[in-house]
Amino acid sequence: MSFSAGESSAATGDPQDFNKFFGEINSPSEAAKTIKAIPKPSVALPESSECASYCASWVNDQSFEILPTDEENRQTEFSSSPLSDSVHSCLGFNRKKERKRRTSGDIEQTDKRKRTEERPSDKITFASNVFDNLARVTAERDNPEKLSKYKNIPGVGTRENIDEGISDINQPSSKSSGVKSKYVEVMSLFQKSIQKFSIMNLDYMYTFDWNHYSKKNIQYVVFTKVCQSHAPGHFVEMLKEDCSCRDCGSADLAVKVRLTVPLDLSDIPIPCSEDIQIHVSFLADDLLERHISSNVNRSSNRDDLDFSRRTCEKMYDLYQKMMRGQSSRMYTEWFDKCKIFVKNFLFSKSLHLYHGNVIRRKIEESQTLNKRRCFIFAQIFDLE
């Protein structure tokens, strides 16, 4: 509770003036009108001639006691004030206000001093660093030498591959940080950051798992589609479910065939609780050309295989009919020839994959066995 200057002067004046200020509480008629029962003060009111100044204080019944003071010009105090202990008088209350004002003023002056002392060179340095980093990233992105292995790949030139290749270039190479093991290389294919059509390569050479290849649940033949609206050196491949080119939007798509082989991971220390499989799919006409150019296995039935556009589209139609429950002897014979051709040509060879695309991943985690599958389209590779 605070009093103004007029209130404090009334409290230190004549008792009659004081009673006029708070109301005529000594008059029985006026007291009966305003207050039902006013307790008698503990100290009798002295005459005005006895003492010139008085002090008003709070009591529990919210009435007032008029206490004499010794000094005539003494500041009026609240003897039993309900306010906090730090406020004992009007003067102390005003001093506290002044102290708060002075403290806030000091804070404002300190902030102004900090703002004036702040060097503008810091902001300039920060801005220059930001623009330097932006210029460096732009230079790396526009540098044709760094993107040559993605732009100048024969048979590969999709827009998605180039964009994702830029992100791979900016990431630190695993070779620079140290030689990674085969296990780390295989498990890196199942990281959360890897998405569909992500570009990848394998540093190690891998042989093929022919024991697993003989199982019937392997998808040996995979149908894809290639856009025919691009230049002859620009190869844009999509999944068989696509109806238009993801690069240019053209609907002129040709059916292609890929032949799939699982990699041999027996020399990798994989825990017993992990069932990991990596399947690599090669373009059938590319394998056939490599087989023709080589001097081995001339006795194989390569002359009976045909991966032309007409043959691939015909086999794709038969494949769709088989998926609907119909049987096709022609497709079964062609499928078996593809299996024999792949095994005869790749049986004693090892794969070194320089450029591939992660097409599909499947991760199943259970309490007893964790299954991890990765399906890769091989674009640039060596067979030794």
Swiss-Prot record:
Region (Disordered): 1-23, 69-121
Skewed-composition ranges (Polar residues): 1-11, 76-87
Bias (Basic and acidic residues) ranges: 103-121
Name this polypeptide is given: Uncharacterized protein K06H7.7
Source species taxonomy: Eukaryota, Metazoa, Ecdysozoa, Nematoda, Chromadorea
